[in-house]
Amino acid sequence: MSSGNETVLIGKVSATHGVRGQLRITPFSGDVDSLLTLRSIMVKKPGGEMEIFAVAASKAHGKKVIITLKAFDNINQVLHLVGRELYALREQLPELPEDEYYWCDLLGLQVVTEEGESLGELVDIIVTGSNDVYVVQGSGREILIPALADVVLDVDSDAKRMTVSLPEGLLDL
């Protein structure tokens, strides 16, 4: 496990919520509850610098989280945050249930089939209505792999490897 000072990508500001400066957050772990206990978050500025904000309140809103930051009380003050990535210190985040991962722990993994064939590197994750989709880049092509329990057989964080069982015909697409 990494040090507690490591920053972890936890989500993205998808929209404002109401007129009092609240933000609608799309979590990147699939676990809405993991964001409800945060007392501070970091927002990455366009230049890459992190800005820290104290969280006044948070609540679940379906598959999203509504966060109120102490520094803001008006929608106009938070409009510049829409679309920005959110980070937290790993030490502030709860341990996820088995077989759930924070995005930062998956991005960069080498993806291989159960037969040992290298498919490439996991470079992005697409959030869909039902299950996430892993974007794997390798051998000059992009492969979209559904993030399903019967497809993702193993994630070995130490070896930085994900083993998958591809659905019939997926590589033919």
From Swiss-Prot:
GO terms for biological process: ribosomal small subunit biogenesis; rRNA processing. Residues 98-170 form the PRC barrel domain. Keywords: Chaperone, Cytoplasm, Ribosome biogenesis, rRNA processing. Its main location: cytoplasm. It comes from the Bacteria. GO terms for molecular function: ribosome binding. The keyword Chaperone applies. One of its GO terms (cellular component) is ribosome. It is found in: Cytoplasm. It holds the Pfam family PRC_RimM. An accessory protein needed during the final step in the assembly of 30S ribosomal subunit, possibly for assembly of the head region. Essential for efficient processing of 16S rRNA. May be needed both before and after RbfA during the maturation of 16S rRNA. It has affinity for free ribosomal 30S subunits but not for 70S ribosomes. The PRC barrel domain binds ribosomal protein uS19. Belongs to the RimM family. Binds ribosomal protein uS19. This is Ribosome maturation factor RimM. The gene is rimM.
